[in-house]
């Protein structure tokens, strides 16, 4: 179902999703405990999608929930994701790149399974969460391998079909790129936005996006990233939390 602007309407609009954002919600508590770095990333993405949703007229609560839980499947193997690793540990160093690809890509199916099992997440929200990588290539592992077929290193999910799914994909990609650029001391919000969206478009991930919506998203994210630039998105506390857990 869509509204007059072609945006999808939540099949359970009367279903209040705000309680899923409470810090005491059991699944969120488990996610935050097992994946401190990923949960912080998810909260940052949540702030981005919330701001974008407001200007696009989307359900900002649903979008924020989808952002908070889009990576919850990483709980199955948290140490394999860089945001949850300490500086001196990376289990991928000793693995074949394709094995690493299989491990990382599995979090999409794991996310779907966890959210379906929870029973409080409507199906359209689960779809948004599980389309956030589309068929993107894991360039790091592909470049590390000697494989010539990049399709072997693509996520095997569906490309985003709705404005909500595309917004989450864009915000997730931009948050990850911003974090990396900040850590390397070369963060420029406008460059991050333009290059990230251009890469997604060139790879065919945003084929369903309307030009007008895309411009609105760029402008909204520019404001969000300017604020993040002042605060310098930082995952050091999450790393400290991990280190403290190891020492207990």
Task: Go through each PLM region and give its residues.
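Low-complexity, compositionally biased segments
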Residues: 6-8, 53, 62, 244
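Histone-fold modules and their flanking histone-like tails across chromatin and transcription assemblies
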Residues: 11, 20-21, 144-150, 154, ...
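Divalent metal-dependent catalytic cores for phosphoryl transfer on phosphate-bearing substrates
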Residues: 28-41, 46-190, 199-203
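Long, hydrophobic alpha-helical segments that serve as membrane-spanning/inserting helices
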Residues: 201, 205-248
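Non-catalytic interface/linker regions that flank or bridge core catalytic/transmembrane domains
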Residues: 1-32, 248
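Regulatory/sensor and coupling segments of signal-transduction and defense proteins
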Residues: 10, 15, 22, 156, ...
């Amino acid at each position: 179902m869509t509204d007059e602007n072609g945006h999808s309407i939540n099949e359970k609009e009367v279903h209040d999703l705000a309680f899923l954002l409470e810090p005491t919600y059991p699944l969120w508590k488990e996610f935050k405990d097992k994946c401190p770095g990923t949960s912080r990333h998810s909260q940052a993405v949540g702030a981005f999608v919330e701001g974008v949703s407001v200007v696009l007229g989307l359900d900002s609560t649903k979008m924020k929930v989808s952002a908070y839980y889009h990576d919850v499947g990483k709980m199955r193997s948290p140490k394999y994701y860089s945001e949850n690793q300490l500086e001196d540990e990376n289990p991928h160093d000793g693995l074949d790149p394709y094995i690493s690809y299989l491990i990382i890509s599995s979090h999409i199916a794991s996310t779907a399974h966890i959210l379906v099992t929870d029973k409080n997440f409507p199906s359209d929200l689960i779809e948004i969460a599980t389309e956030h990588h589309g068929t993107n290539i894991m360039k790091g592992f592909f470049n590390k391998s000697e494989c010539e077929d990049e399709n072997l290193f693509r996520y095997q999910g569906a490309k985003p079909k709705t404005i909500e799914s595309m917004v989450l994909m864009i915000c997730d990609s931009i948050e990850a790129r911003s974090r990396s650029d900040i850590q390397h001391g070369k963060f420029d919000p406008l460059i991050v936005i333009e290059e990230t969206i251009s890469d997604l478009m060139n790879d065919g991930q945003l084929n369903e996006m309307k030009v007008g919506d895309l411009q609105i998203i760029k402008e909204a994210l520019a404001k969000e990233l300017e604020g993040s630039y002042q605060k310098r998105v930082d995952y050091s506390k999450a790393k400290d939390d991990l280190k403290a857990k190891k020492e207990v």
